[in-house]
Amino acid sequence: MGSGPRGALSLLLLLLAPPSRPAAGCPAPCSCAGTLVDCGRRGLTWASLPTAFPVDTTELVLTGNNLTALPPGLLDALPALRTAHLGANPWRCDCRLVPLRAWLAGRPERAPYRDLRCVAPPALRGRLLPYLAEDELRAACAPGPLCWGALAAQLALLGLGLLHALLLVLLLCRLRRLRARARARAAARLSLTDPLVAERAGTDES
C-alpha cells in the first residue's frame, strides 16, 4: 500500500523536474526545443537580437527578421552549431558582415546559405553573401570614427615628419652659411698676413 503514495510522489517530482534545458537558457523572444533555438519571424534587428544563445545549440533559426548584420562572434561562440537559418533578412553587405562571411566560409556545405543575398549597398545588391570577397565587404564600409582617427593620426605624423625635414634643411643651410663666413674670414686674414710675411722674407734676405 505504501508504494502507492511513493509512486504518486515520484510522478509528481518527475513532472515538476526542470527540462533538459533550463527556461533561463532560452533567450527571449525565442522558443527552444532541445538544442534547437527558434528566433524566426520575430521582427528582430541588430539592436533587439539576443546577445547570446545556449552553448549547446545545434540549430539556430533567424529567418524572416530585419537583420542587416550579426554581432561579431555570435555564431563562433556556438561550437555545436551545425545549421543556422539566416534567409529572408535584409543583409547589408559591408564590413560588419565580415565575421559572418568568415563563418560561412568555414562551413562544409554552402548550399543551405545560397539564398543569402545583399540588399545594400547598391553596388552589391543582389550578390550572394557566401561568395563575396572580404575586400568587397570592407570596401563597402564608410569610414567610421576609428578610420577618421587613424587618418588624423597619420596626417599628424606626416606633418611632424615634414616639419622635421624643414628644420633639418634650415639647419643645413645655416651650417653652410657659417662655414662660408668662416672661410671668408680665413681668406681675409690670409690676405692680410701675406704682405707681412713677404715683407719679412725680403728683409731677411737683405
UniProtKB/Swiss-Prot annotation:
GO CC aspect terms: glycoprotein Ib-IX-V complex; plasma membrane
Glycosylation sites: N66
Membrane topology qualifier: Single-pass type I membrane protein
Keywords: Bernard Soulier syndrome, Blood coagulation, Cell adhesion, Disease variant, Disulfide bond, Glycoprotein, Hemostasis, Leucine-rich repeat, Membrane, Phosphoprotein, Signal, Transmembrane, Transmembrane helix
Note: Platelet activation apparently involves disruption of the macromolecular complex of GP-Ib with the platelet glycoprotein IX (GP-IX) and dissociation of GP-Ib from the actin-binding protein.
Disease note: Bernard-Soulier syndrome: A coagulation disorder characterized by a prolonged bleeding time, unusually large platelets, thrombocytopenia, and impaired prothrombin consumption.
Annotated protein name in UniProt: Platelet glycoprotein Ib beta chain
Organism, scientific name: Homo sapiens (Human)
